[in-house]
Amino acid sequence: MGFRLSKIYTRTGDKGETGLGDGRRVPKDHPRIEAIGEVDTLNSQLGVLLAGLAAAGLNELVAVLAPCQHRLFDLGGELAMPSYQALNAAEVTRLETVIDCWNEELGPLENFILPGGSALVAQAHVCRSLARSAERRCQHLNALEPLAGVGLAYINRLSDLLFVAARLIGRRQGVAEVLWEAAARP
């Protein structure tokens, strides 16, 4: 099956350090831990989005986004164990294919849009912005300790997918996009 965690607490992190999958101990504010934490936060919020999509019967979106939770867990594994590679280019291509398909249905943007219109649209934008934050944390780590594999490309493409997903959710719900209105000029 998979990995089993028989003990949840170890007390080894009580003094501000944590262990990586390769056995190293690092401070809990180490850039690698920051990156892992941002990916974990994104994954948690993606779970909230998926629960809402399932409840709303938006199974097409669930079918595309549910595997992303697993791939984010894979990315976390890659970050925790630098020699471990789980993601591959086919995962990035899968996201690009869906983006192109959904974007063709939606058509071009005429204006900037704001997160909102419905709770699900807003939650998709929360996930998108968290994907960008996770990407920044991963890029910061990459500048210090170069990352192997396609994780950086995956997280970048995932944020694009989540933007397009937000638009598609609105379309499926019959909710108009909230267009940005520039401040009046004095």
What are these language model-derived features?
Residues 1-186:
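Phosphate/pyrophosphate-binding loop motifs in nucleotide- or prenyl diphosphate-using proteins
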